[in-house]
Amino acid sequence: MSHLVKEIHSTLLDDSYYRIDHPSGLTILVMPKAGYSSAYALFGTKYGSIDTRFKRSDEADFTEVPEGIAHFLEHKLFESEDLDAFARYAKTGASANAYTSFERTCYLFSCAGNFKASLEILLDFVQSPYFTEQTVQKEQGIIGDRKSVV
C-alpha cells in the first residue's frame, strides 16, 4: 500500500509541513524543524466529551455510551498489564500528557532524544487498550470524584 504524501506551505507560519494520508485512514502531519533540540508528537482522535454515541462501520445502529466516556478512555489508555505508558516514557526521557476537549481526545509527548522509541510507545498504547474489571472500577471512582468537585 502506498501513502499519499503532500507538502503544504503555510503562509501564516511561513513554513512547510507534510500531510501523509495513511491507508488505515489516519492522517499524519509532520513538521521537521532543523536546529531544534526537542521533538513533539500528538495523536488526536475525533472523539470528545460531547460524543455519547457512535456507529461502527459493521453495525446498522448507533451505540449509546455514558457521558464522560471520552475522559474515562483518556485515562485508561495509559494503562497496560505490565508497565503503564508514563513509566515507559520515563525510560526514554520523554514527558507525556493527554487532554479531552468537546470534540477531541489527544495524547502527546515531547522529548529531547529517543523520538522513534517514544513514538512507538504512543502508537502502541493508543491502539492496545487494557481493561480489567478492577481497573475500570478504580477509574470510574476517580472520574466520579472529579465530577463531584466541579
Regions found by a protein language model. Give the residues of each.
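M16/MPP (pitrilysin/insulinase) zinc-metallopeptidase core fold and M16-derived inactive scaffolds
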Residues: 42-117
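Conserved small/polar residues in nucleotide/adenosyl-binding loops
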Residues: 149-150
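M16/insulysin-pitrilysin zinc metalloprotease superfamily fold
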Residues: 80-81, 109-145
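Domain-wide signal for the mature, well-folded portions of proteins, strongly enriched
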Residues: 23, 29-30, 108-110, 146
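A generic short-segment signal for beta-strand/edge and adjacent turn/coil regions
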Residues: 8-14, 74-80, 90, 128-130
